[in-house]
């Protein structure tokens, strides 16, 4: 019975809410963009358009999955499944406030799995056997790999400040003050890097509708497309939850774990709304600007900050207290 709970019910209890949150994030996005463009957004299906995501999901999954005759059959269908599997597995070490698996190296696990997501994009672009998909996929891979570097270095700095690799440690470290306050340059670079990592505007070069039709998923329709869509939005929510854990640590009251969960979800939701706000406000970056930003601005800065955070405790450790 215990194994049933830990291996079946526990994972389901966090997969289902994540998928529901993803569904309603799509609705929120359409509503926010609608109001920013002085229109209503979805308002027909259900009260205030609240059932729109359910109608969308149903429509996508009952469509026929069309596969291009020249595509690689196995890879074409395996990559969307891989994308969603990775997006959902990433939630396992998240302290909301108790994780599904409390990993010792939770931060590294998140970093490793999020860089594996590149392979789903790589496979789908190549398996589609289409020029547009290939160009979109090459852009996506270059962008994701480039921003992984800055994300990794920012994480390293934050780990040095916090003193632990488990995501639970961040809650303890931020009991007196949010990490956002002393490490605001890190937080700003982290947030921009997560935008690029999740292929969101203004870094949505992979799916630039004006030039690439739809990017790496141009040949996908129906079910497999829905899986990619779910994976993308699950990643957005995950990155924002991670940002909230790292820089806006939820104060954990052991007697009321529900409050911590509510606290964290509210912060993640607000950060996600800022994602949508950015999408409505900024034009798309040019490819070379995107690469200049990470390699010429973020990389030197993050490297300097890693060295600074390493040197500071070592330099001050030899001094007597209360100088």
UniProtKB/Swiss-Prot annotation:
It is a multi-pass membrane protein. Belongs to the complex I subunit 1 family. The keyword NAD applies. HAMAP family: NDH1_NuoH. The gene is MT-ND1. One of its GO terms (biological process) is aerobic respiration. Its EC number is 7.1.1.2. It comes from the Eukaryota. The chain crosses the membrane at residues 8-28, 74-94, 105-125, 145-165, 176-196, 236-256, 258-278, 298-318. Signal peptide: none annotated. It is an enzyme of class 7 (translocase). This is NADH-ubiquinone oxidoreductase chain 1. InterPro entries: NADH_UbQ_OxRdtase_su1/FPO (IPR001694), NADH_UbQ_OxRdtase_su1_CS (IPR018086). Keywords: Electron transport, Membrane, Mitochondrion, Mitochondrion inner membrane, NAD, Respiratory chain, Translocase, Transmembrane, Transmembrane helix, Transport, Ubiquinone. One of its GO terms (cellular component) is mitochondrial inner membrane. Coiled coil: none annotated. It is found in: Mitochondrion inner membrane. It catalyses: a ubiquinone + NADH + 5 H(+)(in) = a ubiquinol + NAD(+) + 4 H(+)(out). Core subunit of the mitochondrial membrane respiratory chain NADH dehydrogenase (Complex I) that is believed to belong to the minimal assembly required for catalysis. Complex I functions in the transfer of electrons from NADH to the respiratory chain. The immediate electron acceptor for the enzyme is believed to be ubiquinone. It holds the Pfam family NADHdh. One of its GO terms (molecular function) is NADH dehydrogenase (ubiquinone) activity.
